[in-house]
């Protein structure tokens, strides 16, 4: 009986975490505004060292979450992205990922 109570409490905890982690498209639209400064420019390259900046509109949501978490933790190295991601909460990351995943990567469509 005790195990059942523990499992029930654990299930409630996990369900509340998933509800919190769900991304909000409209919030992501506001939070992703600065992303377009680099990622919204076709053929954009940042200065030394030169990196091609990928267009991230329409990218897979889970990929975006993993990438932003990697930049936040420092596992992925890019000074600009590390600094940008450092300020993001997990909710911010989810919101931004949901918004960007719903966009197009076709510049002519924008």
Where on the chain are the PLM-derived regions?
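Short loop/beta submotifs within extracellular cysteine-rich repeat domains
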Residues: 46, 63, 77, 105-106
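Gly/Gly-Pro-rich "capping" loops immediately C-terminal to redox-active cysteine motifs
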Residues: 25, 29, 42-71, 82-84
């Amino acid at each position: 009986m005790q195990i059942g109570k523990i499992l029930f409490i654990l299930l409630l905890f996990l369900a509340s975490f998933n509800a919190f982690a769900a991304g909000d498209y409209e919030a992501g639209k506001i939070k992703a505004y600065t992303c377009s400064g680099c990622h919204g420019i076709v053929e954009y390259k940042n200065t030394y060292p030169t990196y091609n900046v990928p267009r991230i509109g329409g990218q897979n949501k889970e990929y975006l979450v993993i990438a932003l978490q990697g930049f936040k933790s420092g596992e992925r190295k890019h000074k600009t992205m590390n600094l940008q991601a450092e300020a993001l909460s997990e909710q911010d990351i989810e919101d931004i990922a949901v918004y960007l995943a719903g966009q197009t990567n076709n510049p002519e469509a924008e």
